[in-house]
């Protein structure tokens, strides 16, 4: 994680100028080999970055990373977080398409606001859900960074 920190900081700064939409942290597959391990990993990632935030962020819990309304906070930034890991089957919305790695994707709130300043239109939401359904992976909008089931 130490090696990723400079690129994490840079990506979040670039989100403010529109040069980036977020950051993807690639971790070894074992970090997401089971749902329980993925929860532990995500809590550890949030805590590690949070400890390096100004202001310093309080520790998070498993309940935080499974809460669909939870946003990751770092400094003045907020990001919606999704995890893709080997523990998810092909029909799951968080399936990693056969990649052996675990990915933690931080989508900065500015990425949403640039495209849809008020809120994401209903038509866009429907199109996203339809695309997921057509791919056999029903879109699940009520899951947190880590879903509560695999």
Language model features with spans:
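Eukaryotic short linear interaction motifs
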Residues: 32, 88-91, 113
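Sequence-level detector for tyrosine residue identity
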Residues: 23, 49, 95, 139-141, ...
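Aromatic/basic-lined ligand-recognition segments
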Residues: 60-106
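Polybasic, proline/glycine-rich intrinsically disordered low-complexity segments
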Residues: 100-150
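Surface-exposed beta-strand edges and their flanking turn/coil or helix-capping segments
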Residues: 38-40, 87, 94-96, 117-121
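An acidic- and aromatic-residue-enriched active-site/binding cleft used to recognize and process polar
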Residues: 27-30, 84-86, 109
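Long acidic/polar interaction regions in large eukaryotic complex-forming proteins
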Residues: 1-66
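Short secondary-structure junctions and interdomain/linker hinges
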Residues: 15-19, 88, 135-142
């Amino acid at each position: 994680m130490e090696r990723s920190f400079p690129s994490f900081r840079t990506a979040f700064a670039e989100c403010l100028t529109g040069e980036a939409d977020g950051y993807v942290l690639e971790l070894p597959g074992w970090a997401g080999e089971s749902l329980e391990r993925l929860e532990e990993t995500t809590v550890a990632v949030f805590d590690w970055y949070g400890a390096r935030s100004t202001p310093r962020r309080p520790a998070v819990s498993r309940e935080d990373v499974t809460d669909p309304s939870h946003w990751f906070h770092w400094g003045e930034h907020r990001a919606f977080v999704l995890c893709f890991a080997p523990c998810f089957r092909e029909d799951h919305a968080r399936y990693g398409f056969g990649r052996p790695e675990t990915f933690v994707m931080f989508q900065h709130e500015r990425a949403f606001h640039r495209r849809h300043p008020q809120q994401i239109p209903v038509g866009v939401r429907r199109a996203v859900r339809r695309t997921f359904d057509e791919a056999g992976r029903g879109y699940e909008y009520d899951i947190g960074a880590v879903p509560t089931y695999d």
